[in-house]
A protein has these predicted regions:
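C-terminal helical "tail/cap" subdomain of flavin- and related membrane-associated enzymes
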Residues: 314-351
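Beta1/beta-strand and adjacent pyrophosphate-binding region of the FAD-binding site
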Residues: 2-16
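Conserved FAD-binding catalytic core of PHBH/FMO-like flavoproteins
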Residues: 149-151, 162-259, 263-265
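FAD/FMN-dependent oxidoreductases across multiple families
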Residues: 235-327
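Conserved N-terminal helical subregion
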Residues: 3-4, 73, 78-171, 180-184
């Protein structure tokens, strides 16, 4: 039975939602995580982070979980800018000085399993919120559909981690107060058995495009392309066809993919919006892309999601428990913590 009362209901069980459930578990008796996806869903998104991201995982106590996903650590990259090639080595500041990229199909289940291991976290998938219960301006619960059955639950805190297109954010009145339209289209696919180094990434920065290859598992690579909308309009070519052509014609990746094989379809999205919504209100809180979405062109979204989860965790930890925690002022705290990431990404997006 999922009905009844839960201290926390988390809507969304991916990076932000699973990490938040894990982080809040010590401060609640019962946490319910609702995720609309099925366990086998393919997410055409690349989760990449550098030293700052490693520190963010460590602050939440999840770094070992992430490392256990088996993705190689990269300590440098090859950059092709026009026809010039530069080899870079990342500064070795400490034990966190490396980059990683983990497929979402591996990372997300690992984080959900970690949350579940707390013992007081229940995960339902696929499950959707059909409606919210709001009384006197405060969120009190939700109507949840799971297995074709609707159930009503009550909660002390509703955490929305259901992405940049969150309908539930609209339901609680969390409208976007800052929006930046992006002209970039992001695509990716996964490849196997490429004859490429496993300790470094590859970046090809060309006219209105960025092509990236990153090792992300045992004999597995993520090949991603950021494509400017003006180039799509100019060529009239479907973005997936441009992806295939640009990968094939790249002097480094072309020969590599001819030897290996693509193991997934090409997926992606375009015409996305960077946005900021309020982080908290009476009985609710937004984490991850639901409240703060950065264009994926700069690969800062994973760290941003972890920062929002950590900010909420720290506020609850200061109160000792979820019930009664004062969540006012979180929006300003989050925006200050992520201002550099926003400014950098907005600069790239606006060109």
């Amino acid at each position: 039975m999922i009905g009844g009362h839960w201290e926390v209901v988390v809507v969304g069980g991916r990076i932000a939602g699973a990490s938040t459930a894990w982080a809040l578990a010590p401060y609640a008796q019962r946490i319910l995580v609702l995720d609309a996806s099925r366990p086998t869903a393919f997410w055409p998104q690349q989760s990449t982070w550098d030293r700052d991201g490693n520190l963010a995982w460590a602050e939440l106590g999840l770094l070992e979980t992430v490392l256990a996903c088996g993705a190689p650590r990269t300590y440098g990259d090859t950059q092709r800018i026009g026809e010039d090639v530069v080899e870079r080595v990342y500064p070795r500041v400490d034990a966190y000085s490396y980059r990683m990229s983990v497929p979402r199909e591996v990372l997300d289940p690992a984080l959900l399993a970690a949350a579940r291991s707390r013992g007081n976290v229940t995960v339902l998938r696929p499950a959707r919120v059909r409606d919210l219960t709001i009384d006197a301006g405060r969120v009190r619960g939700a109507t949840v559909r799971h297995g074709g059955v609707d159930s009503r639950v009550t909660c002390d805190l509703l955490v929305l981690a259901d992405g940049r297109l969150s309908h539930n954010a609209q339901r609680v009145g969390a409208g976007a107060y800052r929006v930046v339209e992006s002209p970039w289209f992001a695509l990716l696919a996964y490849y196997e058995n490429l004859p490429l180094p496993t300790d470094r990434s590859y970046f090809s920065l060309q006219d209105r495009s960025v092509l990236i290859s990153t090792p992300c598992g045992d004999k597995q690579w993520c090949v991603a392309l950021d494509l400017h909308q003006s180039l799509i309009d100019e060529t009239g070519r479907h973005p997936a066809r441009s992806y295939e052509r640009m990968v094939r014609d790249d002097p480094r990746l072309g020969p590599a993919v001819a030897v290996g094989r693509r193991s997934t379809s090409i997926g992606g999205a375009g015409r996305m919006r960077m946005l900021r919504r309020p982080m908290s209100g009476p009985g609710w809180c937004l984490v991850g892309d639901a409240g703060y979405h950065l264009d994926p062109v700069t690969a800062q979204g994973t760290r941003a999601a972890l920062v929002t989860a950590r900010i909420l965790r720290d506020r609850v930890a200061g109160a000792g428990r979820v019930v009664g925690a004062d969540l006012t002022g979180l929006t300003d705290e989050r925006d200050a913590a992520l201002e550099a990431d926003w400014a950098y990404t907005e600069q790239i997006v606006r060109g």
